[in-house]
């Protein structure tokens, strides 16, 4: 099944009219004085209601502005579609306003929030790991403590973020290796890292030794292949040495690059999104192989991480409820490709004589 890997809806032939703002074929209707699609109407309403002012690095001359340049998109809402700011009602419920907007209002009154364009330098690893301090994860969930995991959703996501941002790293990315000896070295190293991670993972104290050994296997897999693929995406360390390589290993790495790597490059996860994706992969894989106790713990992790991610979107991004639902759906859907990757990895390990 072909997976959609962006926030855009997949292309389809349609007789629907074209939205004058985004130029996409869609159902259009009157919104705030203009005829536009529901997505552009939602974008306009949110921008005006929160008093946000976008900046464009091309002086509002961007082409194909949908989702790419919000400044040009908003300008098109006003100048092309004729939408009127005066028809948007002010938000009175403060619970529906992102925290950074409220903080900005407290500092400057209601002068508006300026959102600049994103620098291309932010595609590098060090900038992705500092998109938002760990302390900025949603923390207003003290009453939402999991009785099973004994932690809140935000603390759970923070636990996984710290594993990615501050965890022990091997000196070589898995997607750059060429021989089974190098893979053996990585597997040996990550086996120890996975054992350490499992000792501190919420809910592990409820599992028996067999379940813990299985969980370690999936933590190891996620470190070696999932996290390495994400970091490979924005790394400049690409190896082109093909003089000495293992054919089966190279075939599998090629498969990872043509599936997971392409999906990650299109979705452009920040560290919170990737961390949630990685955690969901681990516990979805675990869910189908273990005891009832493990299934309960796995479900708690899945629900906790998902809830924390949604809270992060609502608090620190400009995504509306529909965009958040689409984004979470994209992340969850991508997990299905990891299932096949895991099974193919198991075959590779058996072929190479690696412990599995």
Swiss-Prot record:
GO molecular function: DNA-binding transcription factor activity; sequence-specific DNA binding; zinc ion binding
Localization terms from the record: Nucleus
GO cellular component: nucleus
DNA-binding positions: 16-90
Keywords: DNA-binding, Metal-binding, Nucleus, Receptor, Transcription, Transcription regulation, Zinc, Zinc-finger
Domain NR LBD: 144-356
Gene3D superfamilies: Erythroid Transcription Factor GATA-1, subunit A, Retinoid X Receptor
Zinc finger boundaries on the chain: NR C4-type: 19-40, 56-72
Cystine crosslinks: none
InterPro entries according to UniProt: NHR-like_dom_sf, Nucl_hrmn_rcpt_lig-bd, Znf_hrmn_rcpt, Znf_NHR/GATA
Protein family membership: Belongs to the nuclear hormone receptor family.
Task of the protein: Orphan nuclear receptor.
Protein name in the entry: Nuclear hormone receptor family member nhr-169
Gene source species: Caenorhabditis elegans
The encoding gene: nhr-169
